């Protein structure tokens, strides 16, 4: 089986779950060709894994004018009717105004380059992650090139503007849709015609638990960790407020912030205004190995998000046996069970957040209990080997025209060792 993977920017430091999924499918014998609309910046290539993937990925932008012209001319001559249908689809799914029309023209031109590459490499199917602009390119490329496509629906951003990104049309035209949680699937169902609900399936993002060594918890804790993009949806100002409330009682408390993003300067200023400069370290993007090292030196992982999918970094913390405090946003509660493997606090509530952090700092046995339960949850339900095997089964059966359950089953022909390798 030969399939293509498309994202807007690949590989990125924040999208390691896509790299794991690609690697898992390759281990199962699938020929996966990676495509990306844009080339990531050097700051995203933080590990050898990202650098290797970047070397083997086809980048649509910046376009070679002759390649773009040749691709579209070839597609037009091969099937004028299909080319015109694709133009009509691009027109009907454009965003409002002249700006929307201009962007749709760019997407159509990019789609032609992608479609021709997929045809030349005799690829059977195209799968897209993060179905906003790159999802539009995937949908148009599939129409231009006469092949099937699917996508993974994550959220939260596409649910802010579902009609702008024509989520309804993408679901309706896809062979299948992978939803990262039941919550995510329910939101897709809001915008999809009911006859298309059966093509929406649950495939979790996942991690390899064996890469994480469980942390040993003893005595009082004092080390907090956040990993993620420094953007408004992550609620970091609330985390900083909570830290300021806790410092009088816990004078040795410290927070490490791994990641970068548009809000970094504002967050650093807030840190200074709250008198926390000596307690908060901003270390930027880190490799997967470095993130695992940070987890080994952490007592509590905190994520105060306002909007989410199901954060992979929460899975990583739980796999390392680190107790988590998070908000019950979107699919988070399908991973974090309140008072079983972590604490869930209301979004935007700095007081509740600081109270729960304090409980975990004070109680090593509670940290240990949550850590053990968290690792078990991830191992059982968010194991990348199992999720990739489910995806492999979903792709195979869908391309054969067979129906699939909402939660695809593991292929019974695979030996346990193949699922866990």
Q: What is the predicted function of each stretch?
A:
Residues 171, 285-286, 293-298:
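Short alpha-helical donor nucleotide-sugar binding micro-motif in glycosyltransferases
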Residues 183, 206:
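Carbohydrate-associated surface elements
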Residues 252, 279, 352, 359, ...:
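A short, well-ordered alpha-helix in the C-terminal region of glycosyltransferases
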Residues 306:
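Aromatic "clamp/platform" in nucleotide-sugar-dependent glycosyltransferases that forms part
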Residues 323-326, 336:
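Short hydrophobic beta-strand element within catalytic cores of glycosyltransferases
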Residues 338-339, 343-350, 359-364:
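Conserved acidic donor-binding segment of nucleotide-sugar-dependent glycosyltransferases
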């Amino acid at each position: 089986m030969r399939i293509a993977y498309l994202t807007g920017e690949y590989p990125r430091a924040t999208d390691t779950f896509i790299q794991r999924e690609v690697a898992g499918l390759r281990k199962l014998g699938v020929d996966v060709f990676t495509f990306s609309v844009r080339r990531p910046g050097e700051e995203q290539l933080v590990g050898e894994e990202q650098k290797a993937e970047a070397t083997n990925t086809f980048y649509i932008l910046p376009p070679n004018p002759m390649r773009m012209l040749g691709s579209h001319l070839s597609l037009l001559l091969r099937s004028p009717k299909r080319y015109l249908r694709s133009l009509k689809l691009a027109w009907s799914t454009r965003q409002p105004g002249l700006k929307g029309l201009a962007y749709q023209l760019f997407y159509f031109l990019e789609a032609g380059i992608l479609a021709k590459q997929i045809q030349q490499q005799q690829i059977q199917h195209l799968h897209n992650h993060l179905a906003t602009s790159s999802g539009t390119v995937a949908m148009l490329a599939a129409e231009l090139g006469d092949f099937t496509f699917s996508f993974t629906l994550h959220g939260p951003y596409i649910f802010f503007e579902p009609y702008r990104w024509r989520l309804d049309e993408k679901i309706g035209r896809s062979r299948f849709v992978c939803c990262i949680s039941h919550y995510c699937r329910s939101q897709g169902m809001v915008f999809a015609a009911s006859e298309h609900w059966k093509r929406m399936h649950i495939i979790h993002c996942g991690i390899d638990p064996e890469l994480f060594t469980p942390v040993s918890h003893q005595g009082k804790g004092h080390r907090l960790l956040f990993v993620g993009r420094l953007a408004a949806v992550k609620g970091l100002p609330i985390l900083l407020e909570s830290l300021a409330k806790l410092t009088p009682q816990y004078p040795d408390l410290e927070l490490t912030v791994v990641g970068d993003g548009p809000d970094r300067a504002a967050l650093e200023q807030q840190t200074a205004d709250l008198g926390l400069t000596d307690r908060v370290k901003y270390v930027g993007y880190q490799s997967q190995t470095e993130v695992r090292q940070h987890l080994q030196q952490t007592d509590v992982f905190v994520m105060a998000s306002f909007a989410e999918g199901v954060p992979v970094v929460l899975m990583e913390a739980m796999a390392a046996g680190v107790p988590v405090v998070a908000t019950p946003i979107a699919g988070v509660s399908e991973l974090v069970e309140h008072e079983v493997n972590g604490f869930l606090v209301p979004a935007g509530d700095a007081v509740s957040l600081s109270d729960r952090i304090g409980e975990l700092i004070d109680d090593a046995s509670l940290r240990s209990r949550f850590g053990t339960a968290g690792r078990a949850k991830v191992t059982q339900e968010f194991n990348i080997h199992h999720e990739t095997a489910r995806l492999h089964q979903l792709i195979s059966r869908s391309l054969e025209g067979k129906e699939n359950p909402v939660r695809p089953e593991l292929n019974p022909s695979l030996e346990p060792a193949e699922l866990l390798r």
